[in-house]
Each structure stands twice: as C-alpha cells, then as structure tokens.
Amino acid sequence: MGWLRRNKPYDRSRLLKGAARARKKGKRQKAIALYRELLAVEPDNADLHRRIAPLLAETKQPAAAWASYRRAADKLVSQGFVEQAVGMLREASVYLPREPEVWGRLADLELQRRRLVDAHKVLLEGRRHFRSKRDRSHAILLLFRARKLAPRDFSTNYDLAGLLAKAGARGRARSLLEEIASWTRAGQLRRVRARQFALSPTPAAAWGWLRALVCG
C-alpha cells in the first residue's frame, strides 16, 4: 500500500559518519553512494565535493572527480577563499594530472592572487604530463598560455616551437624560432639554429647554424 510508505528522513549526521567509516575501511563505492545522498540535498556544499572527489578519482571516474573538484573550488572562490581553492586544485592535480583544465584553472587562481611566476610554473608543470602525440594539443595550449606570461622564457618558447613543428604548423614554428633567435644568446642560440636547419635545411639556415657554432 503506497500511501503507507514514508520517505526515509534526511539524516545528515548518519550519512556523514557512514561515509567516513566506509572510506576508512576502503569501501570507496559505498562511501561515494553515501556522499551522493548528501549532495542530492546539498549540491553546492564545497566540503562534500572535496570529500567525494578523491574517491571518484581513485575509482577511475576522472570526469566526475574533476566536476566535484571544480565545483568545490569555484564555491570557495565565490566565498573569498581563494587560497583554499588553490590547495584543493593542487590536490586535484595529484589525482588528475592528465586533466588539462586542472592546470588552466590553477593558473587562473594564481594570477588572481597576482602570482605570475607561480602561474607560469603551474602551466609548465601541467605541460609535462602531456607528452604523447595524442596529447600534443593540450601541451601546445598550455605552452601558449605560459608564453603569454613569460614571453622571453627560452624553455617555454623552444618547447612550443618543437611541438608546433611536430603538429604540422611548420610556418608558425619557423616564425617562433626566428623570434627566439633575435633575443637569445650563446648555447641557446646554437640550439635554435640547429632546429631551424632541421626544419628548413637551406644554405641560409646552414650558415646561421655554423655561425652560431663558431661565434657561440
């Protein structure tokens, strides 16, 4: 008789304790289920998203994990807790290093804190997790952002030029290498001239490489 049924009352304390107990015992799926019950009632609770996110990552649900990390971080930022949001995204970068949005959002928050150098480091750190041909587009985007923050950082520009060449954007790679050559010196210039020659093995490129070898 349906009219006799009663919905189970929302017992927040019971659910929290049950989820914590399940997590402690390694019962991740049970903990996730309990946290989801809580989130069904409190969808914007940053602390609940922070608790469930690593469990989702550990159970190979990266998209759901990132959604929770992002939601929690955004909520903290809206409340003025930018430093806590940075800490949360740092945790996300450990669990989800191959989620490019993690690095982009983390860099955004470092810029919000006026920490340009840290934002640049974050983008380069993220780039290192995208090494394969399949990931090349993510690496290129991160490097373009890093280049905007440090236009004359040699490693950023040199790496970007190499990836552009591999991606088939040889014209852009050549232009970037020529730009680097205009302000770099010595050993770095030799590397630039060598890469220019590899891209365009012309007499002019060969002469530029030779001159860098002799004069550098």
What are these regions (language model features)?
Residues 1-216:
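Repeat-based scaffolding regions
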